[in-house]
């Protein structure tokens, strides 16, 4: 199956997981430019999807790869995706970020808050001094950095597809958001959850 199709499978698994866990979820449909008149402008979605959990809105941009890193290339992570996720941080009770799926060697998914992503991207591209434990790639975000700065999305493989425990993820992210006032807090700080 092609990479694009695997990305759609990932989106469908996230959507089904949300429905199974009774989470309000909305997936924004992409416009297929092939169905438009020649020269028609294609609207650009702000996010792939969002979900609502316990008074918080989570705008997500989903990325899937079989590689060990996800490129910063504008073909992969589009400027408007970064722009709108960053803009969403201005509002209370909104936790925006990426869901990065690394399909191989074993399916791993990480939520990376847009602020943590932008900090890493700036350091990586400018080759600045940093405190990351793992190797910094100038042109991509590797799985090791996602493990370090992100929050793992727990999952269970069924016969073919995955169920992602989005309720647990959102509970963890809300606790991290609520503790943001504390000094030196980032989204990769471990927290105890009772979700």
Curated annotation (Swiss-Prot):
Domain of life: Bacteria
Gene Ontology molecular function: any one: nucleic acid binding
Coiled-coil spans in chain: none
SUPFAM superfamilies: Restriction endonuclease-like
Name assigned to this protein: SPbeta prophage-derived uncharacterized protein YotM
Organism: Bacillus subtilis (strain 168)
